[in-house]
Amino acid sequence: MATEQRPFHLVVFGASGFTGQFVTEEVAREQVDPERSSRLPWAVAGRSREKLQRVLEKAALKLGRPTLSSEVGIIICDIANPASLDEMAKQATVVPNCVGPYRFYGEPVIKACIENGASCIDISGEPQFLELMQLKYHEKAADKGVYIIGSSGFDSIPADLGVIYTRNKMNGTLTAVESFLTIHSGPEGLSIHDGTWKSAIYGFGDQSNLRKLRNASNLKPVPLVGPKLKRRWPISYCRELKGYSIPFMGSDVSVVRRTQRYLYENLEESPVQYAAYATVGGITSVIKLMFAGLFFLFFVRFGIGRQLLIKFPWFFSFGYFSKQGPTQKQIDAASFTLTFFGQGYSQGIGTDKNKPNIKICTQVKGPEAGYVATPIAMVQAAMTLLNDASHLPKAGGVFTPGAAFSKTKLIDRLNKHGIEFSVISSSEV
């Protein structure tokens, strides 16, 4: 991507927010990466100069770089002020947008970026927002030659690129994949900032509009290759992982399906069926999550119920979500494993009448998901936009990570930065 006309290659919008501060630290690390062959001019953006300055000072102290504050630009802008967003976008090649919930605050940033020739990356896990933005802005972004790429954090780069990695490693045709997410915690347990909780509340409370949006898009069904992937029960036992699992409620399924549609329609690649699950351990954890899920699904249906869920996240999530977010000790001790079980056909075997005769197991492993892996994924996606333009879709547009980055070296970048892709096993049946 052309960067020479703009003062900043990256502008981190929402840098003083809970997730934004971690993204800021990650860009600061990337700035001094010994493998960098060129300088990385960048800035932070938000409503308060004081807060932005404090974030830079905190990052400088943590990274041992006392001059960091003087090396990074500061841009004052506000979601409520479109002119200020325009000024920010004019100065950036890529805007990593950390301001959510995106259903409320994401569209003005996308609009400003498209109108002013900047690309934009977000870390939304909200299917309605992601799908609506593609419907509304894909052609406009393509006309401007800019890239708008959603869900470029833990939701949903590991899942989306994990399916592509699995397909690339199979010696044949991959037809179906199930993924199982396992979150590992240390002795102090897990905690997630309530911004993620709020996004889930608004998303579940607005399921009817998501269905209307999908019905209005009038998309033709993607061909079914191989046997139809059977859905598991809401609570099922995974023999391979020796634990119970539930359907994963994030954006992964929506994102992966959109990617597979793009790869089929634009690159003539065989579409892969996909289902996502999360492991929950033993029966005690299952019972605890059942109660939490029932509470959530009951209260999220009503306006006053949603207000209570938002006001008391720790209580209704059984301690998983809080307004304070995780401590540094909790972050340092946490990690994730995303395991993929795929099936398909060896070369020369027809997919219409025969049963799948190849199985493959792959994994994506990484550090704490929300505030370590997400910034790594977001920043490396941004660096891929800047440095691997020849392997991006030729025209701009609104893309999923897999659609945008399937031909790039993003997986190699992630491997070098601690999000590791590997093959566990592969065999003919």
UniProtKB/Swiss-Prot annotation:
Keyword Nucleotide-binding: no
Record bears the keyword Oxidoreductase: yes
Family: Belongs to the saccharopine dehydrogenase family.
Record-listed N-acetylalanine modification sites: A2
Pfam families xrefs: Sacchrp_dh_NADP
Protein name: Saccharopine dehydrogenase-like oxidoreductase
Molecular function as annotated in GO: oxidoreductase activity
Membrane-crossing segments per the record: none
Gene3D superfamilies documented for this protein: NAD(P)-binding Rossmann-like Domain (3.40.50.720)
Residues modified as Phosphoserine: S217
EC class (word): oxidoreductase
Keywords, in A-Z order: Acetylation, Oxidoreductase, Phosphoprotein
EC id: 1.-.-.-
Biological processes per GO annotation: glycolipid biosynthetic process
GO CC terms, sorted: lipid droplet; mitochondrion; plasma membrane
